[in-house]
Design a protein with these regions (language model features):
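Short, aromatic-enriched amphipathic alpha-helices that serve as compact interaction elements
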Residues: 1-9, 13
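Loop/turn elements at helix/coil->beta-strand transitions in domains of secreted/extracellular proteins
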Residues: 7-8, 16, 66, 115-116
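Short, solvent-exposed secondary-structure junction/capping segments
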Residues: 12-38
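A mature extracytoplasmic/lumenal domain signature
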Residues: 14-17, 24-26, 74, 89-93, ...
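Ser/Thr- (and often Asn-) enriched beta-sheet segments in non-cytosolic proteins
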Residues: 19-21, 65-76, 92, 107-109, ...
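Surface-exposed, charged secondary-structure patches
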Residues: 33-99
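Low-complexity, intrinsically disordered terminal/linker segments enriched in charged
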Residues: 95-148
Length: 148
């Protein structure tokens, strides 16, 4: 739905009270001493469904192409609540203006099979810095969210 820029589909997919955490990698320029590598910082923001979708509309207009590659899927069923699943996956995102590589977590609700919903969407960078992978135990999964 991102690559086809189908905002109507995304509107149906996210629950009205969805927790949406977006991250953006801020790349700084190399130090002038020539010895230091550029540092990467990640800026996180919590968005409501409405503000997230409004921002997507702008991104869709600004970018001719948006490419996504998904891999490393991990699916976990909620231990006590039927129909809830956590999906963690690696996402490589590239567009005309920005690119990143990180992990998405989506909390899916299939209790109404006709209209599945996403209640939680998070993003984390794959790399903590130029040399350090995000430790696997720090990647969000269904255990990070209290669903009571």
């Amino acid at each position: 739905s991102y690559t086809t820029k189908d905002i109507d589909f995304l509107t149906q997919l996210f629950s009205e009270e969805a927790l949406i955490i977006v991250g953006k990698v801020i790349r700084s320029t190399p130090q002038t001493d020539g010895k230091s590598l550029p540092q990467h910082q990640v800026e996180y923001n919590i968005k409501s469904k409405r503000t997230y979708l409004e921002r997507l509309k702008i991104l869709f207009r600004q970018n001719k192409e948006i490419n996504l590659q998904f891999s490393d899927f991990k699916i976990m069923r909620h231990p006590t609540q039927e129909g809830l699943y956590g999906v963690t996956l690696r996402q490589k995102y590239s567009s005309d203006l920005y690119s990143d590589d990180g992990y998405l977590f989506l909390l899916w609700d299939f209790r109404d099979e006709a209209t599945p919903l996403i209640h939680v969407r998070t993003w984390q960078p794959r790399m903590l810095d130029d040399r350090t992978l995000l430790p696997e135990e720090e990647i969000f999964n269904i255990r990070n969210f209290n669903l009571q």
